[in-house]
Structures are given as C-alpha cells and as structure tokens.
Amino acid sequence: MNASHQDTGFFTEALSERDPELFGAITSELGRQRDEIELIASENIVSAAVMQAQGSVMTNKYAEGYPGRRYYGGCQYVDIAENLAIERAKQLFGCGFANVQPNSGSQANQGVFQALIKPGDTILGMSLDAGGHLTHGAAPNQSGKWFNAVQYGVRQQDNLLDYDQVEALAKEHRPKLIIAGGSAIPRQIDFARMREIADMVGAYLHVDMAHFAGLVAAGEHPSPFPHAHVATTTTHKTLRGPRGGMILTNDEDIAKKVNSAIFPGIQGGPLMHVIAAKAVAFGEALRPEFKTYIQQVIANAQALSDQLIKGGLDTVTHGTDTHVVLVDLRPKGVKGNATEKALGRAHITCNKNGVPFDPEKPTVTSGIRLGSPAGTTRGFAETEFRQIADWIIEVVDGLAANGEDANEAVEDKVKAQVAALCAKFPIYPNL
C-alpha cells in the first residue's frame, strides 16, 4: 500500500489554512473578548498555560478508569496529569478525596445523585426563581423529573436564604439529600446551619459551590467542609480554569460511591486534555497571587454594587459577599431582556436574570446578573468597576427614556468608552 491516503498537511497545517471558516469565528470571538467588558458572573478568562494544556496532545488519549486502574494501556502520562489535578484539588480545599473527571458542574451533581440517592427519593434544593440552579430539582431538569424535588427560597423582607423554611420543609418531607448553593446568590451560606438541618432528618448535605469555589480556595469564603458530606463545583468561574466539574468529600465511603457513579455510572472516558488544564488552574490557584486576585474580585463586586445603588438601581440583598451582583431593574422601569441587549450593544456583556419574587417571565425578567471575575482577571480594580457601573446606569437611563429603538446614541457613546478602557487592559497579546 502506498502513502497516497495520507493527508500531507494533517500534522502541520495551521487552523487558518485548514478551516478558514472556523478560524474566522474564533478570531471574531477573540476580538469580542478583547474589546468588550465581560460581566457574566459564571465566566472568566483563563491563562495562556491553561489553554495550552487544553489544546495539548492529551486530547488524543482514552483513559477509562482512574490513575493506576485504567482499562486502556499507555496511560502512564495522563495518570500524572490526573494525579496532579487530584492532589492540588485536595490541597486547595483541605479535603481527603477529589474526583476531577466530571465534564461539567451539572454532571458532577448527577454523579452525586447517582452515588447517594435513587430515583423517586426526595431532595431539597433552592428554587430556580430564588437563585438556585436547574440541577437542584427544577422541573424541566433531570433532577426534577427523576426525584421528588422540594424547593426552598428566600425571605421576602430581605431576600436572604430562609433557613427556617429549609428546616420546616426538611421536617415535613424528610429528604434524603439537601442541596446548598445556587447560581444567583450574592451572600454567603451558613453551612453549619444547613448541616444541622440535614442531621435533624438524616439527610446528606450536598454543597454546590460552583460559583464561589475560587473564593473558598483563596480562604475568602467559608469552606463547606467539615459541614458538607459532599461538595461539587465547576472548575471555571471563580476557579479560573477550563470548563469542567469536580466532586470533593472527606468521607472515604462516599468517595468510593462517587468514583463508581462517575465511571462507569454516567461517563466513559474522561477528557484528559481538560483534566490537564484543571491541574494547571489548580496549581495557579495555590499561588499567593490567587488570594490577592480573589480579594480584588470581592472588592470589585462590592464597588460595582455600591455604585449601581448610588445611581438609582437596587441590588438583591443591597450588596454582595461574593463575586455576584444581582441587579433589580424595577426602580428604572426597564426589563432584563431589553437591558441585556442594550448593554450588549454598548459592549458590556451580562445576562438577564430573575430576581426573587419576580413578576416577569424567565424570558423577560426584572433583573440582570453581573459578576466581577473576568474584569478582575483583566486587571480592573474598584475605580474601573465604579466607572462600569456609571456606564450601566447611563445605558439603563437611556433605555428608560428613549426605548429600545432610540437609544443608539447613548449606547454608541458608552461603547467608545468601553473600547478605550479595554485597550488599557489587553488580554492574550500573543494570539
């Protein structure tokens, strides 16, 4: 057989030559990230080293199983990567066991469910409209279909987590699993109180710290341990790693169940290039400068919230302990969907979000969710975030006065100022 079947450019041809159409999309996305202010609370900007690991030859390797116990040969080097990720995760969070194979935070949660409960069991989680996550028992999600999902919320008077309601619901419904955490919670959670409630009814306490894991790792947020039986997280967001998930515990029996639940329970071969990138990110998070970064993340979120309130908006709980600022737009008489689009045209990226007891549909909303991680990674500090808050107020005021179709002048003015600020804080100069 001759070598005519070989693609001569397979190992050498650049993406720009190989697939100009896709290369164009990637180039445009790089431009968007460089030129726009990213305020989506669940997003961040990874290091060049994380991207290099994720784009490495480890993408070629199948590695079903766990380090030292694989179902494929040739895993000696991917074992090094996974062991690095595991040991660094354990060091970051002060726990005894870590599974770094979940492909996402949702799959990490599914792994916990597979390990600890069975279909039809009762779970107790925060409702989506109070700031919870889809995977905590929301009706459209698998967690809401497979389990008897009971939902708790926040207090109407201050929008803080209603621990008395959690306790009452736990005593009434006797859940097997109680979930603490969410996707739009600006305040810290009292894990000790949640464990006390779990112990009252013999439930597992599962902390989903996907949003605030970076704060925990830096020692700037209470740790779920020793209170949680098990904790899950994403590895992006405030941890500033690749998109992925992770499960942590101090209980060896739970760890064994979790490992079996992830593989062979809900996943096959892990994504070794992503696990390699997780190891890099965890190593970065162990450095002293990461603590400084997280301190700035929190300070920036608080500066953003304070300035928005001064400008006539409200923020849920009137502030934040974390990186999340949940903005109530009702004082200005505008909706979340229109505000998201208007800010997007001004090159400030955020997402519409419901606020507690929101009268609007989820596709409309009365709020927007903002976050400080990505801007802080760029180098923004309080001064920049106060300026960003002023721009948000300017766009929102224009939207209220002019409507969606006549706010172009305001949006264009802010867009030019955004471009000037982003130029002072460049990202990825070598791309």
Curated annotation (Swiss-Prot):
Keyword terms: Amino-acid biosynthesis, Cytoplasm, One-carbon metabolism, Pyridoxal phosphate, Transferase
Top-level taxon of origin: Bacteria
Record field: transmembrane: none
Predominant location: cytoplasm
GO MF annotations, alphabetized: glycine hydroxymethyltransferase activity; pyridoxal phosphate binding
Cofactor(s), names only, from the UniProt record: pyridoxal 5'-phosphate
Root EC class: transferase
Subcellular location per the Swiss-Prot or TrEMBL entry: Cytoplasm
Pathway given in the UniProt record: One-carbon metabolism; tetrahydrofolate interconversion; Amino-acid biosynthesis; glycine biosynthesis; glycine from L-serine: step 1/1
Residue list for modification N6-(pyridoxal phosphate)lysine: K237
GO biological process per UniProt: glycine biosynthetic process from serine; tetrahydrofolate interconversion
Site label Plays an important role in substrate specificity, positions: H236
EC number(s) on file: 2.1.2.1
Catalytic reactions on record: (6R)-5,10-methylene-5,6,7,8-tetrahydrofolate + glycine + H2O = (6S)-5,6,7,8-tetrahydrofolate + L-serine
InterPro entries: PyrdxlP-dep_Trfase (IPR015424), PyrdxlP-dep_Trfase_major (IPR015421), PyrdxlP-dep_Trfase_small (IPR015422), Ser_HO-MeTrfase (IPR001085), Ser_HO-MeTrfase-like (IPR049943), Ser_HO-MeTrfase_PLP_BS (IPR019798), SHMT-like_dom (IPR039429)
GO cellular component: cytosol
Binding site for (6S)-5,6,7,8-tetrahydrofolate: L128, G132, H133, L134
Family statement drawn from the similarity comment of this UniProt entry: Belongs to the SHMT family.
Task of the protein: Catalyzes the reversible interconversion of serine and glycine with tetrahydrofolate (THF) serving as the one-carbon carrier. This reaction serves as the major source of one-carbon groups required for the biosynthesis of purines, thymidylate, methionine, and other important biomolecules. Also exhibits THF-independent aldolase activity toward beta-hydroxyamino acids, producing glycine and aldehydes, via a retro-aldol mechanism.
Assembly mode: Homodimer.
The protein's name in its UniProt record: Serine hydroxymethyltransferase
